[in-house]
């Protein structure tokens, strides 16, 4: 089954919050190295999609599975689609879009996503976990997801009142065919204003199943504080 599953990691060098974020050192490995190595432990069909020669150079000791992409993409989804086209992925193959700033996604979670995707009718699958504190609700770097009783997403926000809010984890799964359809849509106003590409899916009536992961996952890396917390987490392991 893993032969028909691909993990694609979009990564760009520019970041409004952290300069050269993918290359930030976290206990002896760069952020993007940690994400990529985790993915390769799950499947050899793991690739980084980037527009940066610096990122490519940083990863060459790990794997040659680097796809160079345009620097004009407005979202990771669009970058992943370009990479998927270059890899000639089949229409019904499952693509997992793993965010390049999520270094602590466990293998157990990836396997859960694959299983839930096969069991639930959906266009897109993503992940949520428990809110750790009230700070998650008020932190704009922590994306919240609300879902209905069948675990289909109803909204994503950075801050707001939700009926049943959970912390959104940056991973998406879809077939190549669905990915192609999504990237042909115009970005929505809410997507651009909130910098949440998943709103494009939702506002165009694509069903998003939210796989609930009932274990703690450290936050992704968006700020210098996140970097410090990641180092503390690794030092405790």
Predicted region positions:
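Short, high-confidence coil segments that cap the C-terminus of an alpha-helix
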Residues: 43, 89-92, 119-123, 206
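Conserved alpha/beta core of the MobA/IspD/sugar-nucleotide pyrophosphorylase nucleotidyltransferase superfamily
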Residues: 165-237
